[in-house]
Amino acid sequence: MENIMLQEIELKLAISPQIGIELPQYLAKFTILEHQNLFLGNTYYDYPDHFLAKQKMGLRIRQEDQELTLTLKTNGKVVSGLHSRPEYNLPLIEKETPTNAQLRGLYPFEQLPSSTLQPIFSTDFNRTFWLVEFQQSKIEVAFDQGKIIAGEYEQPISEIEFELKSGNVQDLFDFVETLPFERDIYFSSASKAKRGYLLGSKQFLTDWLNKWRDFLKEEREESAVDFCAKFNAVLKMEQKLLEETLSFSPTLFSQDFMKTVERVGAFFNLYHYYDENGKILEAMATEKQKETRLPALLESNQKIFVEIRDLIRFHSETKDNEKTIEKLTALLKSRVYFERMIKLMELSYDLG
C-alpha cells in the first residue's frame, strides 16, 4: 500500500474536563458539517535507544473502529500551541510491530538501527470531533479525553485540537479566539507522544536563572536589528517556562522558599524583557501587518507584569510557597494569558 503525506496545521489547548462538557453547547452556534464520536487506541513504537524520539519523530499504530493506520510524525514547527508538521500514513491490514522496511517506505531515512522496534507506551482516548464552517475555512475541532499509559504510570488526557482542514490560518486564530472560556485553558506544545516518553522518567526543575543569563548573552551576540530571531527565541523560551511550570504540582514548591522565588522571578524577568524591548513587538507587528493587534498585546503584557509583581509582593509578605504557585498557575491558565498567546502566535506564524 502507498503511504500518504499530509501537512498538519493545528492549535492545541490543554483544558479542564469541565470545559470539555461546555464545548458542544458553544459549537452549536456554528454550521456543523460533520460530527462524530470515536474511541482511538494508539500504540507508539521506538527502538531501545529511542532513535525516533531523538529525531523528534513519533511512530504509532492507531486503531479507529476496525481500521489500522501506521503513522510517522516528523519534526515540524511548533510555536507555542501552534503545530505545523508533516506526517506520513500507511494503511495496515493487521496490527503487528512495525518493521524497518515499513519505516523506510514512509520516510527516506539514511540509516536505521539494526535492533527491532518495540512498543513504548499507549494513548487511549475518546475523541469527539466537529467539522465547523467558519468564515472562509473548515476547521476540525477534536476534544480528546482519556489517558497515556507507560508501564505502571498513567497520565490523563484532556485537550482540544483545532486543525485547519481548508482555508487560511488567520481564520483558525480568529475561531479559537472566539472561545468563551475564562480559565483553566492554555496552549500546549507538548504532543501526546512527547508526554508518553516523559511519563515515568524523572523530571527536574530547570535552572531558569542561568537559562535567562544564557539567553541574554546569546541575544547580545546576535544582530541588533534581527527582531525576528529575538522574538522567536523569547517566545520559545516562554512556552518552555510555562509548560514546565504547569507540569509540576504546586506542592513541589511548598517547602522550598527559594524555588518559589526563582520560579516567579523567571516570569518577572520575562515580562521585564518584554517591557524593555517593546520595539521587538512593534517591528514584528509591522512586518506581519498586525499593527491593529499591537495595543491590546502591549496592554496584556503590562497587565500580566503587574500581576507578577503583585505575586512577588504576596510571597514576600506571606512566605506561602504553595499558595503563590497556585496563584501563578491560575494566571497562566487565565483568559488574559490565552488571548495574549494567540496574538503572539499570529506574529510568529510562517516566520523563519
Curated annotation (Swiss-Prot):
Residues 6-203 form the CYTH domain. Keywords: Hydrolase. It comes from the Bacteria. It catalyses: triphosphate + H2O = phosphate + diphosphate. Pfam families: CYTH. GO terms for molecular function: inorganic triphosphate phosphatase activity. The keyword Hydrolase applies. The keyword Protein biosynthesis does not apply. Its EC number is 3.6.1.25. Gene3D superfamilies: Hypothetical Protein Pfu-838710-001. InterPro entries: CYTH-like_dom_sf, CYTH_domain, YgiF. SUPFAM superfamilies: CYTH-like phosphatases (SSF55154). PANTHER family: INORGANIC TRIPHOSPHATASE. Involved in the hydrolysis of the beta-gamma-phosphoanhydride linkage of triphosphate-containing substrates (inorganic or nucleoside-linked). Catalyzes the hydrolysis of inorganic triphosphate (PPPi), which could be cytotoxic because of its high affinity for calcium ion, thereby interfering with calcium signaling. This is Inorganic triphosphatase.
